[in-house]
């Protein structure tokens, strides 16, 4: 059996000096069949809010970055039945699960999900009317966050929206618990980046239009919607 050692301690200040993509891929591959429970209990309220304010409607070309087990992806396909919805996730098991359930629930829809690294997306410039990304940036180092944001900017059409969900840093006891979890299994938890990423998105050339905190039980999220300026 393959060795599964996901622990690689983070420095005490919580910095992620480099992205540990191989470990992240393995850990998310391993948990893919149970991950829907986590989405249901901790992410579904923020997913609702992000979708509601995303401006996504039927007939668009929509991209979801880091689909996880596909709960948001199915919502996107549902609101975009005659458009095209693409998804990607680093973990092949997550991507396969997302594709399988979307096809089963919406057999007639153009919905495609593959195992792709968000840091280098295989889409031409200006391909999408909208992109959605929930709880990914916690897992990338700063350089890779910036690189991924450049990719997001590149694949969006002028006037397109970018909806982003981050783990909130506005609940002190949660922050402490997250720092412990992140230092034990960084490939799964990463570290919180909610206070720094919005500025990086702005630096990548997108303008913020909506910014809201939401809490599901003890789990805080921040939902932001950005827009790529029209030419
Ligand atoms: C915390 S989960 C979030 C899943 C889902 N977006 C949600 O809202 O529940 C993070 C996901 O990001 C994926 N991921 C991590 N690094 C990635 C990368 N470089 N490119 C694409 N996906 C990545 C993981 O495989 C995992 O499925």
What do the PLM-derived regions correspond to, one by one?
Residues 41-58:
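Conserved alpha-helix/loop element of class I SAM-dependent methyltransferases that forms part
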Residues 63-120:
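Class I SAM-dependent methyltransferase SAM/SAH-binding core
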Residues 119-131:
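A short acidic, Gly/Pro-enriched loop at the edge of an enzyme's catalytic core
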Residues 130-143:
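A short SAM/SAH-binding and catalytic strip from SAM-dependent methyltransferases
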Residues 146-158:
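A short glycine-rich, Lys/Arg-flanked "PGG" loop and its adjoining helix->strand segment in the class I
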Residues 159-166:
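Conserved beta-strand signature within the Rossmann-like core of class I S-adenosyl-L-methionine
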Residues 189-204:
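Short alpha-helix
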Residues 205-206, 210-231:
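Core SAM-dependent methyltransferase catalytic element
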